[in-house]
Each structure stands twice: as C-alpha cells, then as structure tokens.
C-alpha cells in the first residue's frame, strides 16, 4: 500500500469517516486499530518487531516510574533520621537502577536496529529491515529517556503507548515526534473541522506535486549518471549532484507534507521537518532547517548530554589556561558535534561513505566555530572596505551559494556507490568541469538516454523555479501558502486547487512504462 496510491487514499478516507463517527473519547482506538492494521498489511509478520518495541517501551517506562516513586517514598519516610549524605547515597543507588532499566530498553531496541541494518548475517537469515524501524525506534527510545529524565510522566495505558509508537502516517519516514508534543493530540479525540480537512488536503496535494512532478522525474538523471559516473565529464557528475539535492528535497519533504497533511485531517499537528533548508547561510543553519526532527533528537539525546557531561566540562577547564577562553568554550562542543554527526551518518547506513558524510558535516561546522572570531574580523574588514552590508542581498546570495556547495560535497558521499567513488567524483567535478556543457541541448545530447526528453528537462526547470519562488515568498513574507489560498475568494481558491490537481495529473511522472520510485527515506 504505497503512500501515493488509490488503496492508501481509500484507507485514509475510510479511517477518517470511522474516526469522526465514533464518540470523541473512543476516537484514539480507531487510530490505533487503523495504525496496526496498516502495519500488518504492509509488513505482515514484521509487525512483531514494532510490537516488541511497544512492549519494551511501555514496560521500561512503567518500571522506571515505579523505582522512582518507591525511592521518593522511602526517602520521605526517613526524612528525620537520614542525614544529607545518606539520602544522597540512596538516591544514587536508585538512579543507577533506573539507568539500568533505561539501558536495557535502549540496548534491546537499538541492538535489533543495528543487527538488522548493519550486520550482513541478517540478510542471509532472510530478515529484511522492517518498514520505519529507524523512525519508530528513535521516537520510542526518546520517550524512554524523557521518562528517565523526569521530563514527562509515563503513560499507564499500554494501548496508548502502542498508538504513540505506531501512528500510521509517520511510520514510513517520520517525522520523529517528541512524546509531549504528539501524545495528547493522539488521545484527546478531535472535533470535525472543515479547516483541518482543507489545510490537510492542500498539504497532501503539495507533497504529491513535489514527489510526482519533480522528484520522480529528476531521479532518472541521477540513476543514469551514477550507474557509471566515471564515464561522464565532471560537469555532468556535478550536474547529477545538484539534481540529487533537488530530488532528495522534493522526495523527502513531499513525503513529509503528505504525512503531515493526513495527520492534520485528523486534527493532529505534527512537527515540521523542513524549513526551506537551501536558503541557509551556514551549514549549522542548514542542519537546523533540514530533517529537523532527527536533528532535534540528536541534539537532545546525544549532543547536549555529551557537551555538558563532566568529562567534557573538565576538558574545557583544562583547555582554558593553555589555549584561551574561546577554544576552551567552543572545542568541547565541537567534538560533541562531530560525534553527533557521525551518529547521523551511520544512521543512514553501514557503508563507510555515510561515515564520511557525517564527518564532513561535523568537521566543517567544527572549523567554522573554531575560526569564528577570525572569520568575523575578515568579513567585517571586507564589508567595511567594499561598503556592502553584512545582511544585504549580495552577502546573502554569496552565503547561500557557498553553503549549498558545502551541502553538495556531503551529497557526493550519499549518491556514490562507495567512499572511493565519491572522492573520484569530487576530483572529477573540480578538474573536468566545463560550464558550456550545461546548455539544454548538451544535456539532452549527453543525458538523453536517461529517459527524459527536452520537454521533461524544461518542465523540471520550470517547476523547480516555481517551487523555489513559492518557498522564497513564504520565507521572506512569513506566509503560509495554504492560509493565503484559503483566504482568497471562492472562485480563485478553487482555480488554484484545480490548477494543482491539473499539474499532478498532466505533468506527474507516472503511468505505463514508468517505474514509480519509492520514497528515499523509506529505506531507513
């Protein structure tokens, strides 16, 4: 049951009807039944993996809570006869017990994920990667860690925990939800509101447009060049990398738009996963705009715990008298950042190329932080000398283009078959680049065998420019295009909606002879 298919549309509509027909207090049962049914339909017996995650998530959070309450009760009962040191020692013993329970849940779930994703023997045993396992594992283990940290109260209802872990729209490719932002929305039972249906449907339409019109058309160029990248000039290797940046963004954000739109029809607001990332002026800013829920998860559960740990704080103190205040303040956080990006890289796959992907991003950000004072002085001198404004149009364009080039280097490791090929592709892109080869006629001549003709290339360019124009307006005017459309008079509103449907039907890349491309992040 593909995300963009008639079967899935019928499933969602049927579930919507059932959801709003039931009394409010029972509506979450409909979501749970629909979510589990959906997972069984698409994954068959692999549903056992998500059931295991549900059970360990529920059991560990309840256990942690019981240990904490028992500890607090005993400490309270000995308020008069225990001194401060005794209370401290007892609490430390209790904390270690709770850590053990948390680690048990983490090791069980991340262990299964690692075995299925990174150990070759899993494939030999006939075990495939269960759909969405990375996403629901990260989400549920984040909840376990939040309970341990006493950020949230554990949910006592097993079925409600099951719904939080398995909510069907996000199971394929996220977004990765934080418990206290999503859980209550799932359980409360929402009223039927026309505005939710309208805004959700518009977001779904927008996601389908990005996927079918742009992403599935662009993927032909990428597959064609990456099949034998050394047979092409550096110009077309670079061109394929740029197209990949476009295709990945259209594919992933399109899928997330569909997911968020469906959730919104049920009255549920899911976290934003993209915020116009290619308008970023630095790599750090990019990672705050791209795959935002994964970035938030890694910051909350890897970066911050590392950077404020005793070992890292002591390292900072050791650095201060030797290298000065700036290095002592920044370097520990930079090392934590590099470790975090290594985890992000490895999350994408077991191939060494993903390790290099993580290292590239982490090291570039680390160098930017370490040399920030120097960069600031150089930039300040440049702007003073030229009379240009630091936040003017010229500076913004240069910053955005430079950041995009840094992003693009990372993508070489993503699209190449392996790390060695990625390095060869990078070298070729620098030493064998000829801008004259980027004319449409030359592109058709050299890449025509990929299955796209001049019409497809022009359509890809026009639709991409339209997409980025809309994104530019949203970015600069702080405008939600859906609110803009729904605020228009009825004839214009429907004209825009019908135009979107027309674009999908007429210009969508599907039909006889076309192999539909899966969403990229389904594989994770």
Give residue ranges: language-model regions.
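Membrane-embedded transmembrane alpha-helical bundles that form the catalytic cores
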Residues: 1-523
């Amino acid at each position: 049951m593909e995300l963009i298919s008639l079967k899935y549309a019928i499933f969602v509509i049927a579930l919507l009807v059932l959801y709003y027909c039931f009394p409010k207090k029972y509506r979450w049962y409909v979501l749970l039944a629909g979510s589990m049914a959906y997972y069984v339909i698409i994954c068959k017996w692999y549903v056992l993996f998500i059931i295991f995650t549900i059970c360990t998530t529920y059991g560990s959070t309840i256990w942690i809570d019981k240990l904490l309450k028992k500890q607090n009760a005993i400490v309270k009962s000995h308020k008069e006869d225990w001194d401060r040191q005794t209370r401290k020692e007892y609490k430390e013993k209790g904390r270690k017990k709770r850590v053990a329970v948390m680690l048990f849940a983490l090791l069980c779930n991340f262990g299964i994920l690692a075995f299925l994703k990174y150990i070759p023997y899993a494939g030999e045993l006939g075990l495939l990667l269960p759909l969405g396992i990375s996403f629901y594992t990260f989400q549920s283990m984040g909840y376990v860690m939040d309970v341990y940290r006493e950020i949230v109260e554990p949910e006592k209802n097993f079925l409600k925990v099951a719904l939080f872990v398995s909510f069907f729209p996000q199971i394929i490719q996220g977004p990765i939800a934080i418990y206290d932002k999503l859980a209550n929305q799932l359980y409360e039972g929402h009223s039927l509101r026309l505005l939710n249906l309208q805004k959700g449907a518009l977001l779904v339409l927008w996601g389908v447009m990005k996927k079918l019109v742009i992403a599935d058309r662009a993927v032909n160029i990428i597959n064609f060049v990456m099949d034998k990248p050394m047979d092409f000039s550096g110009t077309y290797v670079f061109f394929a990398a740029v197209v990949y940046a476009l295709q990945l963004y259209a594919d992933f954000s399109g899928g997330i738009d569909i997911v968020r739109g469906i959730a919104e029809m049920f009255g549920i607001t899911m976290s934003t996963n993209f915020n116009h990332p290619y308008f970023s002026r630095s790599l750090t800013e990019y990672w705050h705009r791209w795959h935002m829920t994964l970035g938030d998860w890694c910051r909350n559960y890897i970066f911050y715990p590392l950077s404020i740990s005793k070992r890292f704080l002591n390292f900072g103190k050791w650095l201060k008298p030797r290298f000065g205040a700036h290095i002592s303040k920044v370097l520990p956080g930079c090392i934590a950042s590099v470790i975090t990006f290594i985890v992000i890289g490895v999350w994408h796959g077991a191939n060494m190329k993903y390790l290099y992907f993580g290292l590239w991003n982490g090291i570039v950000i680390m160098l930017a932080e370490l040399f920030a004072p120097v960069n600031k002085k150089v930039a300040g001198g440049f702007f003073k000398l030229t009379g240009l404004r630091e936040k003017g149009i010229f500076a913004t364009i240069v910053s955005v283009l430079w950041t995009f080039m840094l992003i693009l280097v990372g993508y070489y490791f993503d699209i190449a078959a392996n790390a060695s090929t990625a390095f060869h592709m990078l070298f070729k892109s620098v030493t064998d680049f000829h801008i004259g080869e980027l004319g449409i006629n030359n592109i058709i001549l050299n890449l025509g065998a990929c299955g796209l003709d001049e019409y497809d290339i022009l359509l890809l360019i026009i639709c991409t420019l339209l997409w980025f124009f809309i994104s530019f307006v949203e970015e600069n005017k702080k405008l939600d295009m859906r609110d803009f459309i729904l605020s228009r008079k009825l004839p214009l509103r429907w004209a825009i909606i019908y135009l979107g449907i027309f674009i999908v039907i007429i210009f969508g890349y599907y039909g006889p002879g076309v192999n539909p491309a899966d969403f990229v992040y389904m594989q994770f």
